[in-house]
């Protein structure tokens, strides 16, 4: 009893979908992430002066997957109630873009566990610019 041809096609489709391109993202996901980052780092975007944990500073042993994991944890803050600062509450479009960015990060391999050192902080703008640089390196 073998597999029927339709089942083989479906299994191959799922295998292709789960294959890791660049940390699990295909070019379209990376393009979407970079597009969102371009929007939220644009000139005059409100709320980007707020402080977030500075998690994108890499040491010698830090892998790119770990940096992405940390960045995802920072972006997750904007889904939680305490991450919605008065500025973001007044500028819901920025909040929605940050939440959209977090959702776009789901294509990234989240199977690793990472820790965040929250003792140092940076501006949201600097965090997003650093994240954009990392994503653009993957895209090129």
From Swiss-Prot:
InterPro entries: 4_helix_cytokine-like_core (IPR009079), IL-4 (IPR002354), IL-4/IL-13 (IPR001325), IL-4/IL-13_CS (IPR018096)
Phenotype of the disrupted gene, per the record: Deletion mutant mice demonstrate anxiety-like behavior in comparison to WT mice. In addition, they show impaired cognitive function.
Pfam families for the chain: IL4
One Gene Ontology cellular component annotation held by this UniProt entry: extracellular space
Top-level lineage group: Eukaryota
Signal peptide: 1-20
Gene Ontology MF: a single term: growth factor activity
GO BP terms in the entry: activated T cell proliferation; autophagy; B cell activation; B cell costimulation; B cell proliferation; cholesterol metabolic process; defense response to protozoan; extrinsic apoptotic signaling pathway
Keywords: Autophagy, B-cell activation, Cytokine, Disulfide bond, Glycoprotein, Growth factor, Secreted, Signal
Glycosylation sites: 61, 91, 117
Location in the cell: Secreted
Cysteines engaged in disulfide bonds, as pairs: 25-107, 47-87, 69-114
Purpose: Cytokine secreted primarily by mast cells, T-cells, eosinophils, and basophils that plays a role in regulating antibody production, hematopoiesis and inflammation, and the development of effector T-cell responses. Induces the expression of class II MHC molecules on resting B-cells. Enhances both secretion and cell surface expression of IgE and IgG1. Also regulates the expression of the low affinity Fc receptor for IgE (CD23) on both lymphocytes and monocytes. Positively regulates IL31RA expression in macrophages.
Family membership noted in the UniProt record: Belongs to the IL-4/IL-13 family.
Subunit description: Interacts with IL4R. Interacts with IL13RA1.
Name the record gives this protein: Interleukin-4
Source organism: Mus musculus
Protein encoded by which gene: Il4
